[in-house]
């Protein structure tokens, strides 16, 4: 196992669940044939203990042990409020 903890930065899509948020992580992928860079998004469920996030916030999340069937990330900080 690696010693570094994975951290990602993304935008909160939904905060409707109790103590959970849905974060959209955007990355750029090069098209295999044409070479153009395309935006791709990944949705990740993260744990928000204090329910401090709102939709549209930019947040930093880090990987942790599995907290539920779909949650294995936790909120580190809110970078910018929406």
From Swiss-Prot:
Q: What InterPro entries has UniProt attached to this entry? A: NA-bd_OB-fold, Ribosomal_uS17, Ribosomal_uS17_bact/chlr, Ribosomal_uS17_CS
Please list the GO terms describing molecular function.
rRNA binding; structural constituent of ribosome
GO CC, sorted alphabetically, is:
cytosolic small ribosomal subunit
Q: List UniProt keywords, sorted A-Z.
A: Ribonucleoprotein, Ribosomal protein, RNA-binding, rRNA-binding
Q: Does the keyword Signal apply?
A: no
GO BP annotations listed: translation
The UniProt entry, under Pfam families, shows:
Ribosomal_S17
Summary of subunit composition and partner proteins: Part of the 30S ribosomal subunit.
- Function, please? One of the primary rRNA binding proteins, it binds specifically to the 5'-end of 16S ribosomal RNA.
Tell me the protein family, please. Answer: Belongs to the universal ribosomal protein uS17 family.
What is the protein's name according to its record? Small ribosomal subunit protein uS17
**The organism of origin for this protein:** Shewanella pealeana (strain ATCC 700345 / ANG-SQ1)
Gene name linked to the record: rpsQ
């Amino acid at each position: 196992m690696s010693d570094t903890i994975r951290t990602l930065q993304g935008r909160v899509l939904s905060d409707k669940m109790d103590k959970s948020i849905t974060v959209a992580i955007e990355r750029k992928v090069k098209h295999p044939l044409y070479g153009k860079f395309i935006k791709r998004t990944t949705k990740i469920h993260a744990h928000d203990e204090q329910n401090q996030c709102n939709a549209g916030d930019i947040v930093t999340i880090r990987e942790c042990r599995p907290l539920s069937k779909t949650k294995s990330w936790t909120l580190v900080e809110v970078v910018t409020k929406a």
